[in-house]
């Protein structure tokens, strides 16, 4: 089961253009390392278009069962799956270079489209949560008011809040938008940036 989940994630990476065929074994081995698995056998058959949310949940459930998560809660699951997705990501310099190539040689729109697609494909933008956001329009005497309840950033659970209070205070990264966030693993009181979509904004 876990072998199939790993193979599905690598296949997803290939389909999304995050992993080339030449890097398939390398990506598999990096995932095995994070999952602390030493034995692996390539499944005979996997879906052609694996579902990312389902695949990540399979990996997270397995990691939780084997004690790789401090707590099986949304905060720790998010930290861990961000680490996993970071294994499929190109280096920051590659993202920046390709963005600027598209910007200068094609168009600013092409560069922005590339970056937005990368943000979605890498799970930095969690599509399966955003679609659950609640939106409606409320009429007021000043005009229509657009109201949104953002469910793509769920509230921290009590255990994570307690852990954040007990966590040693750190001045690194200096802030949540500072350059030092690129590739940062995160902690209970600071978000992970392993799937580093802040590359171009930090670089410019």
Feature roles, as predicted:
Residues 1-203:
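Active-site microenvironments that recognize anionic phosphate/pyrophosphate groups
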């Amino acid at each position: 089961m876990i072998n199939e989940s790993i193979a599905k994630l690598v296949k997803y990476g290939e389909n999304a253009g995050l992993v080339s065929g030449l890097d398939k074994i390398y990506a598999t081995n990096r995932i095995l390392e994070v999952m602390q698995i030493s034995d692996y056998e390539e499944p005979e058959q996997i879906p052609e278009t694996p579902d990312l949310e389902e695949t990540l949940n399979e990996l997270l459930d397995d990691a939780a069962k084997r004690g790789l998560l401090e707590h099986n809660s949304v905060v720790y699951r998010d930290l861990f799956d961000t680490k996993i997705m970071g294994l499929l990501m190109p280096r920051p310099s590659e993202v920046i270079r390709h963005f600027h190539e598209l910007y200068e040689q094609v168009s600013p729109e092409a560069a922005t489209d590339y970056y937005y697609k990368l943000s979605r494909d890498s799970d930095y933008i969690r599509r399966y949560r955003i679609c659950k956001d609640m939106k409606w329009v409320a009429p007021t005497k000043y005009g229509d008011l657009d109201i949104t309840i953002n469910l793509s950033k769920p509230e921290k659970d009590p255990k994570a809040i307690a852990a954040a209070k007990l966590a040693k205070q750190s001045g690194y990264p200096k802030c949540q938008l500072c350059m030092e966030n690129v590739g940062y693993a995160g902690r209970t009181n600071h978000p992970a940036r392993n799937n580093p979509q802040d590359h171009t904004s930090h670089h410019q």
